[in-house]
Amino acid sequence: MQLEKMITEGSNTASAEIDRVSTLEMCRIINDEDKTVPPAVDRVLPDIAAAIDVIHAQVSGGGRLIYLGAGTSGRLGILDASECPPTYGVKPGLVVGLIAGGEYAIQHAVEGAEDSREGGVNDLKNINLTAQDVVVGIAASGRTPYVIAGLEYARQLGCRTVGISCNPGSAVSTTAEFAITPIVGAEVVTGSSRMKAGTAQKLVLNMLSTGLMIKSGKVFGNLMVDVVATNEKLHVRQVNIVKNATGCNAEQAEAALIACERNCKTAIVMVLKNLDAAEAKKRLDQHGGFIRQVLDKE
């Protein structure tokens, strides 16, 4: 696909005079364009749901979720991956973010990194990619060689693959087994795909990881019941989670959390089933960590 023919490289008529308007009008133009992103994501919800089901199946079988991208796309993958351990209590290696150019590229532009097909393959080899893993290639343009080569390598190994881009029929979309393609149109600043395209990608990644965690029993109701309390704010959140899930008061919630070494799931089952910490943990283990199953089946 030629660069000049890509939707993400097109000229946006709504912002053609943006350098001549007031600051407030400038903000209105940008905000109006941003409003078009959620509907674009809405149109690809079936594709996102299909990807979540595949990711969950692979992760349940011992695989990992691997994000692969360059520039803004790579940074968004790293952002999503880095939030999973504290929010859902998973091991840091379960969701992995890889960026063309390595860690230095998180804060700096690395010239030519996104054009390196070898880089995409080597980065996946360096994390010992296996057929159990799912590789999600992220590229607004859909033409990034680093991502395309990584997806090709992943498929050769037998991995399930997902391609996220904002141009229909792109190489990323056709290379991956599953394509998620929110069409957000031309950017306010021509070609600046960190804007609408980046926002769309962030929304999609939010759904992929959150959907995976919900289906993995990391959410009860709408509560993040595997949250790790790494600071005072999260200690308070744990207490509130147990309170909201059980109807107990703060003192009872804190006592239960202390008794089970601050594991929200165990504390919730302790309170709701009137069990000690050891028995509550045992029942959770018997049901794969799903609070709902403990409550519904016992």
Swiss-Prot record:
EC number: 4.2.1.126
Family annotation (InterPro entries): Etherase_MurQ, Glucokinase_regulatory_CS, MURQ/GCKR, SIS_dom, SIS_dom_sf
Induction: Induced by MurNAc 6-phosphate that releases the repressor MurR from the DNA. Repressed by MurR in the absence of MurNAc 6-phosphate.
TM annotation in the entry: none
Entry function: Specifically catalyzes the cleavage of the D-lactyl ether substituent of MurNAc 6-phosphate, producing GlcNAc 6-phosphate and D-lactate. Together with AnmK, is also required for the utilization of anhydro-N-acetylmuramic acid (anhMurNAc) either imported from the medium or derived from its own cell wall murein, and thus plays a role in cell wall recycling.
Record's subunit section: Homodimer.
Protein name per Swiss-Prot or TrEMBL: N-acetylmuramic acid 6-phosphate etherase
The organism of origin for this protein: Shigella flexneri
Origin organism lineage: Bacteria, Pseudomonadati, Pseudomonadota, Gammaproteobacteria, Enterobacterales
